[in-house]
From Swiss-Prot:
Membrane spanning stretches: none
Stated name of the protein: 23S rRNA (uracil(1939)-C(5))-methyltransferase RlmD
Annotated InterPro entries: 23S_rRNA_MeTrfase_RlmD (IPR001566), MeTrfase_TrmA_CS (IPR030391), NA-bd_OB-fold (IPR012340), SAM-dependent_MTases_sf (IPR029063), TRAM_dom (IPR002792), U5_MeTrfase_fam (IPR010280)
Source species of the chain: Cellvibrio japonicus (strain Ueda107)
HAMAP family reported for this sequence: 23SrRNA_methyltr_RlmD
GO biological process, one term: rRNA base methylation
Function: Catalyzes the formation of 5-methyl-uridine at position 1939 (m5U1939) in 23S rRNA.
Pfam families to which the protein is assigned, alphabetical: TRAM, tRNA_U5-meth_tr
């Protein structure tokens, strides 16, 4: 649009007399002297078919990245180096999202997805990519994040920890939806949608859980008129599979009887979870507090079916072993395990050190961890409930001044408050740890916290990925920081 000099009405009147110096009154309907208007790009039409796209690289979440009209385009199902066409999903002010429609020039890393539901199910994002290429992509994501946001490069890159890419997952939560034709949908959310994908099986579930999907669907279908069940959770343990049925209305006697028969026929345990977070009950509605058994580094740990546990037992065992090797504790050392949960690292560590303290904000997990320690006869460890965003407790400060090593295993938000306080303690000479192992489930928060540790004088010695969730975009990693003398 050409810029035109404004007419007389667009000029400000010259102030005179008593009102001079004040902002003059300008009629609201008069033209104003403004900068030339920029033509705003029109938003792209949703579901529009886009032309050929060259996928430049991977994004942090495993999508392909391309350029479209000056915007960054995130393309689901695309691989770096490919030429594809795609359908637009969403157009945002600074970026757009699309999904592959046709692959014109395929990457040698592209494979046929092993799951029949992959095209619609949102549970997995990377089944079109070779497992080896998935690992490489995840490793690059972590290295790029810590370099870009933390300004750090590890001295050495650890070999990736991995398991079988299929049949590894020990826990899943399935949604239930009742269709207008009286059929039942049982499955996971669809990609980019809130609706469910009806699945016959799940290729990443452990076989003991996978075989329960069909019988559970039949049970739901036989009593569809009740429409009481909203979710079904599957959990695997050493003692066998377990099922948790969440319901919003009481189950009728016939439903409960059929569920009891299913449990006996399929050799699984079944509990109910009434609506309202009231805990678990048995099939008769009586409250129960069950436990299952999980093997961690050779130790049988008891856990509640709803406790947080790592979903990949094989990688979890290797992760614990690697953490202990990186910490390299001596038999006379004190080690602190922050965000210890039910003692996934703390309990296996007890046999290697003089003393280990697990710190956790969730009180039921502290209780569970201490009960496991007592049952296993481990008396050189202690579990404490603590607000890990505050280090003003004299006991915590004393422990920090005595510990020779620290392990951090925070949630996705990372440990900014805790690491900031550890940095400040180190600057005051009140933190003695020479080695810090950081277990991360979010490369971005790892990078941020790594920069804080660097400010405290800790160098990034080693970094590696752990493929806890093959075929998904989730990235787990482990880093070793050493204090620079």
């Amino acid at each position: 649009m050409a810029y035109k000099k404004p007419g007389f009405l667009g000029k400000k009147p010259v102030p005179h007399g008593k009102g001079a110096g004040r902002d003059p009154y300008v009629r609201d309907d008069s033209p104003r002297l403004t900068a030339p208007r920029r033509e705003q790009p029109q938003p792209l039409q949703r579901n529009k078919r886009l032309g050929e796209l060259l996928i430049d690289r991977f994004s942090h979440d495993g999508r392909g990245l391309a350029s479209l009209d000056g915007k960054t385009l995130f393309v689901d199902g695309a691989i770096a180096g490919e030429t594809v066409t795609a359908r637009l999903l969403e157009d945002h002010p600074r970026f757009a999202e699309a999904r592959v429609e046709d692959v014109i020039l395929a990457s040698p890393d592209r494979v046929e997805p092993p799951c029949a539901h992959y095209a619609t199910c949102g549970g997995c994002q990377l089944q079109h990519l070779k497992p080896e290429a998935q690992l490489l992509m995840k490793q690059q994501v972590v290295l790029e994040q810590v370099h870009r946001w933390g300004g750090l490069t590890p001295k050495r890159v650890l070999p990736p920890l991995r398991s079988e890419s299929l049949g590894y997952r020990s826990r899943a939560r399935l949604g239930v939806w009742y269709e207008a034709d009286s059929s039942v949908t049982l499955g996971f959310r669809q990609q980019q949608r809130k609706t469910l994908t009806n699945i016959e099986s799940c290729s990443v579930l452990l076989p003991a859980l996978n075989r329960l999907i069909g019988p559970l669907r039949q049970w739901l279908q036989a009593r569809v008129a009740n429409k009481a069940v909203t979710h079904i959770e599957l959990v695997a343990a050493q003692s066998g599979p377990a099922v948790i049925v969440r319901h919003t209305k009481p189950l009728v006697a016939l439903q409960r009887q059929a569920l009891a028969e299913l449990a006996q026929r399929e050799s699984c345990q079944v509990w109910l979870e009434p609506n309202g977070n009231q805990g678990l009950t048995d099939l008769e509605g009586s409250p129960v507090d069950p436990h299952l058994v999980l093997d961690v580094a050779g130790l049988p740990l008891h856990f509640h079916p709803q406790d947080f546990t790592q979903v990949n037992p094989a990688v979890n065992g290797r992760m614990v072993q690697q953490a202990l090797e990186l910490l390299a504790p001596g038999t006379n050392d004190l080690v602190l395990d922050f965000f210890c949960g039910m003692g996934n690292f703390t309990l296996p560590m007890a046999s290697r050190v003089a003393r280990v303290i697990g710190l956790e904000v969730v009180e039921p997990m502290v209780t569970r961890a201490q009960a496991n320690a007592t049952r296993l006869g481990l008396d050189n460890l202690e579990f404490l409930k603590a607000d890990l965003s505050q280090m003003d407790s004299p006991r915590l400060r004393q422990l920090c001044s005595q510990a020779s090593a620290i392990l951090l295993d925070p949630p996705r938000d990372g440990a900014k408050e805790l690491v900031t306080q550890l940095r400040d303690l180190r600057r005051k000479g009140q933190l003695s740890a020479q080695r810090i192992v950081y277990v991360s489930c979010n490369p971005a928060t790892l990078a941020r916290d790594a920069a804080l540790l660097a400010e405290a004088g800790y160098g990034l010695d080693a970094l590696g990925v752990m493929d806890m969730f093959p075929h998904t975009s989730h990235v787990e990693s482990m880093a070793l920081f050493l204090y620079k003398q």
